[in-house]
């Protein structure tokens, strides 16, 4: 049996979800992507659907790979780095997606956490 509180919460949630909210660029979460292989594809697709998130930096060990990845997904005004350390040392990020080979997850995640950056990581 639904209570009055359940009804109010349902109406509020529906209103919040349906309402389009414009988020200023400076208020968006700043995301960096480490590794631009196939795992990064699902991450970037999700980020592109979020209005309060902006991918601002990418790092990949293979020269030119991050630039091609960004172009393929229409990511503009993004900076590119040859490795995760140079990106994390240079950018003010809210979070990073670690999309590297499993053997590189720990070093990338630990370095980001030591810099005070939140980490999104699969496995």
Task: Place the predicted regions along the sequence by residue.
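Beta-loop-alpha module in the N-terminal Rossmann-like domain of NAD(P)-dependent dehydrogenases
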Residues: 78-122
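N-terminal Rossmann-like dinucleotide-binding module
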Residues: 2-73
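Extended hydrophobic/Leu-rich segments
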Residues: 1, 8-9, 84, 109
